[in-house]
């Protein structure tokens, strides 16, 4: 009976094992490695001596045969004490244990570091929390920097939350533990260096290293307070705002670093520097010029508001500019030696009255020259552009208003209404100052004046004006009335100039019929001075005549007869502008006598009439 029961008990576990499914193997089912064997293998790798574990009772090492205490000394070096058939297995176990120890991963929180920046200077705190600064440090050290915590002002009670700090951890690309620790330490040292430099005056001007390795200096600007305030008013706190909100607002809006510097600024960094001797101001720095300009506007508004609160008048830093120098191209031809010319540009009616000008035998005239013209190396220049030496054109002013000597008498400094009043005032005045004289050949000057007078006469004449027909020989007055076609040559006119005085200029007003008045017709057209603005010199001017010219014709020689358009030309113009007039027939009347012969009906023969009567 006992044997049967024993068979049943032995069969029950086998049956239960068949029925229950096999469980999956997990890593927790594997037995842990013996601590003693691990220590032995580690010691073997490091070369440390191993004790005689065979003499210890109850301690059995896997793969190691126990030897007596008499055969082994107390301390035996491993490479020389192990038998040849045991050494390979021990070395393999030691290598595996060393690999496991090297692969053991230390938690990131053990390597990571935290640097509190809550109590740092506002500019440094903003710089460290800026993403651009953090990315620069991350690229250099292969770390990850995160801003955490909450900013706690100095006068605010703690609320249980961590103050503002930077969390530094190693990057995922670093596998070795030693490299991860070194990277975190390097990033922490860079942040601590920035915190230390923030207490000095050079904290803001630390250059960033660009991708090319070159140092890039940021742009900077200073916005001064503009007035002296009483130290007892604590104006620094008004500029900073509660908890530095005003300065932080400018930094957040524009991304520019803002630092309050100068006297009574309470800035520890500027206590022993040159900035402490300057007036109170906001020092702005940025890597982008556009952001710096935007920050300057906000800083100006902030200081204007503070000045209004204290009732002080403030001069804006952006408005304190000196006189803007003129462009370099204008300085080339303008004489700015300090003497300012007051010559009026509007020529009055008595400019040359009563003055007799004698000319040399070469024959020259005296044109009007603007005071802005400076003669350099024998040639007049205006705004750096030399004029042709053979021209005698007067240079008109840039405008009719007053001129400012700081710009070399070029830029008008008056409104259009003031310029108009200035022009009318000096147009009616009769006294003007003398005008400089330049000498040019007579023929070219008279040709230029005759062309200008001809253009003015063409503007004043009507389109279909008829020229008067002179019965007698043409006089000099007729030549001046008939435009540029009848102007005398320059040689003829030069002879008259040398023996007569120049008459005062008069304004030309055409009469009702479009012709010049009789009293103005006595003066030749080439001696008339026009008060209107003259056009620029013509480029297509004829060359100078040769010196070997024939003598001028005698004065008694009559001028050439006037050239009138032919009948064919007049008829062509009439057909062009006027419709052709067809002859109209006289009015008809019902009387038979007034009917034209061509319109009368032909008479019928008498025979046809008789036939008609017979038929009826």
From Swiss-Prot:
Q: Output the superkingdom of the source species.
A: Eukaryota
Q: Which InterPro entries match?
A: KH_1_KHDC4/BBP-like (IPR055256), KH_dom_type_1_sf (IPR036612), PRP5/DDX46/KHDC4_KH (IPR056149), RIK/BLOM7 (IPR031121)
Q: What is this protein called?
A: Protein RIK
Question: Compositional bias of type Pro residues: which residue ranges?
Answer: 534-564
Output compositional bias ranges, type Basic and acidic residues: 1-11, 565-575, 598-610
Write out the GO cellular component annotations. Answer: nucleus
Pfam assignment, any one: KH-I_KHDC4-BBP
Q: Name one GO molecular function term.
A: RNA binding
Indicate yes or no for the key word tRNA-binding: no
